[in-house]
Every structure is written in structure tokens, then in C-alpha cells.
């Protein structure tokens, strides 16, 4: 009997501890900032693994930490808010966060790779890395950069898949043709709902990821991307749409309701566009083409020209102009 009573009270104590852990609490001032310390972390709508994924954040990305309940509610540089597991970011004071932002970085420029314990690709991996990951630059050794993670881990990153951030920015091209070339480099990467990395992308995540590889941040969702930059009502012959414009698809507007945006791609010219649906591939809006996409052609809405508006319009900027990176 006494044993049963003891077990009952143990159960109550565990339940109380569990409820306390789930209680949402504001973050203390000394840890209201943070930096992602895994290659790709998943943001969810709620603080639990069964909740839907809403977007992703990348290694080295600075974030604001808003609340805590065993998970962290964070805000990313594109102002997206979601919940991440406590094991994927390093909370920081404003002072440490500023130090991280000021430090020289190494940027991963290849779609995928690994960082190693030693300057030797046959040594133990420390983690995987993807394009756009940023790590603190600690030095160089042969064909490797010595780097450190936000959580203090040390590693070596091959110079063949990475570049010092300042050098990368100086050599970076942000013109239409360079951006389209990057989009083509992602051909065949699988579709992943809420994905924004080389591991997998959704339609707006493809746009977001391609541009981030050119140091450009734009709104996360297609429904947000559709209303920045210059709106273009597409001519029947597509003569007013340029390579690099974004083309949007969805439910057409009626007298009773506004259009509904549900898909986006990057226009390539000649009625061709690259997009993520199943995987990243090129489709056509010309019925005579072998890759004709009847489904999306019938729900084509309009185009947006965005490149001339980077750093000139709210929500579209390079990282050196984004307040999260300052």
C-alpha cells in the first residue's frame, strides 16, 4: 500500500514537472538572442515534434529568442516566427550576439559538405554543412579553414567548399544571369514542405534559398513574395516578363475575393520557369513544349520584378543591411 502511495506521488511530481516545462515563459535578457548551431534547423508552428513545419534556419544565422517552454520561440532575419527544439540554437546575451555578428566568418558555398575534427577529410566529421552556412573564422591550415560554431565546437572546413565572407561578398554577383545559374544548380533537389536549404525546398523556399546564396533576404512565403517589388500583369505573349522575374500561380481573383497565391517559380524566358514541385525542375507554359505544365499555366496569375528593389524596399535586403546581422 505504502509503495503504491509513493508511486502515485512520484507520478504527480512528474506530471507537475512536465506541466512546468510546458509553461511558456519570456526569455531573460541575458539569453534573448541566439545563433543556429546545426546545418539546418526546422521551425514549427508549435513547440512539439508533431507540430507542422513552417520554415527552416541555417547554421550561423542570428535570431531573436522570444519565449521558452522546453522549446524556443524564435524570430529569423526574414521576420518569420516559429518554435525550434532547444538543442539546435545557442541562446546568447546581446553582447555575445554582437560579438558573433562582428566576427569574421567563413561562408559555405557548396550545396553540401562536412566540417571535420582535423584538416583531413578522412577524419571524424563534426557536422554536415549546406550552402549559406556561416561559421566563425579562427585561422587556416593548408587546404582548410579552422572554424568555430556558435556553441563553441571547433572544426576544419575545406577551402574547396567555402570562402571568407568578405572575399565572398566582394566576388558575389547579384545579377539575373548569376541568380538563374544558381537556380539551375539546384535541379533535382527534392521538394520539402517548408524547406529552405540544399537538402530540400518548397516553391518559395527555392526562391529564398537561391537568393540567400547571393546574400539576399526576401520574404519567406509565396504569398509574401508576391507583393514586393514591381507587379507585372503578364501580356498574352509574355513580352513584358523578363528572365529572373518571379511568376506566381494560384486561385484567380473574382468580384468577391482577392487572388490566392499558392505557387511561385523563377522565369527563364521563352515561357519557361524553374520551380519546386516534386523536385526542382524546369516547366513550360507553351503547349507546344515537351515540358508543358498545363496545371500551372491555367492558374498563372502575374509576375513580380524584385531585383531593382533590394535594399530599397522593406523586407528585401542583403545581410549587411539586415538588422539581425548588425
List each model region and its residues.
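Boundary regions of SH3-family modules and the immediately adjacent low-complexity/disordered segments
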Residues: 22-31, 62, 76-110, 120, ...
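Bacterial Sec-dependent N-terminal signal peptides
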Residues: 1-27
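Soluble non-cytosolic domains of exported or imported proteins
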Residues: 51-54, 123-126, 173-177, 197-202
Amino acid at each position: 500500500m505504502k509503495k503504491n502511495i509513493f508511486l502515485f506521488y512520484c507520478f504527480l511530481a512528474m506530471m507537475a514537472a512536465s506541466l512546468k516545462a510546458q509553461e511558456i515563459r519570456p526569455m531573460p535578457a541575458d539569453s534573448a538572442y541566439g545563433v543556429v548551431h546545426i546545418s539546418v534547423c526546422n521551425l514549427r508552428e508549435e513547440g512539439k515534434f508533431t507540430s507542422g513545419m513552417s520554415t527552416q534556419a541555417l547554421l550561423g544565422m542570428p535570431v531573436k529568442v522570444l519565449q521558452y517552454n522546453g522549446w524556443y520561440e524564435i524570430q529569423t532575419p526574414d521576420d518569420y516566427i516559429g518554435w525550434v527544439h532547444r538543442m539546435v540554437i545557442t541562446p546568447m546575451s546581446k553582447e555575445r550576439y554582437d560579438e558573433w555578428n562582428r566576427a569574421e566568418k567563413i561562408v559555405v558555398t557548396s550545396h553540401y559538405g562536412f566540417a571535420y575534427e582535423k584538416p583531413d577529410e578522412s577524419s571524424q566529421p563534426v557536422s554536415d554543412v549546406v550552402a549559406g552556412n556561416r561559421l566563425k573564422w579562427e585561422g587556416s591550415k593548408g587546404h582548410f579553414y579552422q572554424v568555430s560554431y556558435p556553441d563553441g565546437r571547433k572544426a576544419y572546413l575545406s577551402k574547396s567548399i567555402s570562402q571568407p565572407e568578405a572575399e565572398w561578398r566582394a566576388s558575389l554577383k547579384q545579377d539575373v544571369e548569376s541568380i538563374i545559374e544558381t537556380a539551375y544548380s539546384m535541379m533535382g533537389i527534392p521538394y520539402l514542405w517548408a524547406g529552405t536549404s540544399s537538402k530540400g525546398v518548397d516553391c518559395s523556399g527555392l526562391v529564398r534559398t537561391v537568393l540567400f546564396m547571393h546574400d539576399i533576404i526576401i520574404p519567406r512565403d509565396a504569398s509574401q513574395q508576391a507583393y514586393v517589388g514591381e507587379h507585372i500583369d503578364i501580356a498574352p505573349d509574355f513580352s513584358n516578363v523578363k528572365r529572373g522575374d518571379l511568376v506566381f500561380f494560384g486561385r484567380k481573383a473574382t468580384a468577391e475575393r482577392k487572388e490566392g497565391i499558392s505557387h511561385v517559380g523563377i522565369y527563364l524566358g521563352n515561357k519557361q520557369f524553374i520551380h519546386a514541385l516534386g523536385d526542382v525542375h524546369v516547366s513550360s507554359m507553351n503547349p507546344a513544349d515537351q515540358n508543358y505544365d498545363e496545371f500551372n499555366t491555367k492558374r498563372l496569375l502575374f509576375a513580380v520584378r524584385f531585383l531593382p528593389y533590394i535594399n530599397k524596399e522593406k523586407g528585401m535586403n542583403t545581410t549587411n543591411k539586415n538588422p539581425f546581422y548588425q
